[in-house]
Amino acid sequence: MKRIAHYKNGNYFVDLYEDGTKVRYNDLDNLTPEFVESMDCKISNNCPYGCRFCHEKSTPDGEHGDIMNAEFIDKLRPGTEMAIGGGAVTGHPDLIPFLKKLKSIGVIPSITVNQREYKDNFDLVNRLVEEKLIYGLGVSFTSFDDEFWDNAIKNNPNLVVHLIAGIHGGDVFDYFANKGVKILILGYKDFGRGHDLLEKARAIIQVQIDWLKNNLQNLLSKYTVISFDNLAIEQLDVKSVLTDEQWKEFYQGDDGTHTMYVDLVNKQFAKTSTSTERYPLLSNIDDMFKIIKGGN
């Protein structure tokens, strides 16, 4: 597998490969970073799809972020990963210039799109992949559609299906188990419209989370690659189904130790997208990350 980035961060080295695999290593008993390795970056709050659980509360009249003039972008180091989301990222008028700018400074971007957004902007998304303006493509499941999913998976080797604990049930997990695709399980976010939905359907959501938690060991045997965000790791008690060696190898660290969240619409940054404590953007990414680390 081709290595696309190699750098030193604090007291350790990082290797990043084109399939998304990341390896951190040193000869010490700790990994202490000097600068941020990866960030979630919201570029738009505009979205026509109205998902009931959207924690960003994106709407059809939501604003786009001023993504070409954020000063901290110029201070990002080569190899930094940026997971770009929204809102509907494909609707941002500066998406392609922004991705080209990131590529020119060595930043490694990925985007997350809703399944319907991908279908509505099929040529654009495929262009981003073909021109290597993005290295990763996350697609949030909304419906069963063999033609769509088979073509999307075939044409995008780095495609990852995003599924949400509490929203997607066993039928969805069984569906993708036979398609040879990577999945990312996201924890249920009690934030934004996600909070409103939880107030209305708490029992159903909890049943789905409990089902996933109880069937996790079985699912791990069905998929070649399953990953989790830290919220899902907590909600599903993922550590309990792994050996100590597996946990040590695969766990990437607590939120805010190597990562952060940036909202280019509201010009704020925080530890995660559900953090209530937020700060105004600064001109230097290192200063921003120091604030995040200081709050851990």
PLM regions with names:
Residues 1-24, 261-296:
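Flexible mid-to-C-terminal extensions adjoining Fe-S/redox cofactors in radical SAM and related proteins
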Residues 29-68:
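Canonical Radical SAM [4Fe-4S] cluster-binding loop centered on the CxxxCxxC motif
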Residues 38, 56-67, 78-92, 102-121, ...:
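Core AdoMet radical
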Residues 47, 100-102:
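Non-core capping and flanking segments associated with repeat-based/extracellular domains
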Residues 50, 86, 265-266:
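Residue-level recognition of short loop/turn positions
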Residues 71-75, 96-100:
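Ankyrin repeat (ANK) tandem alpha-helical domains that serve as protein-protein interaction scaffolds
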Residues 72-75, 122-129, 150, 173-174:
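Short amphipathic alpha-helix with an adjacent loop that forms part of the alpha/beta core around
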Residues 133-286:
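Radical SAM enzyme [4Fe-4S]-AdoMet core and its adjacent flexible, acidic
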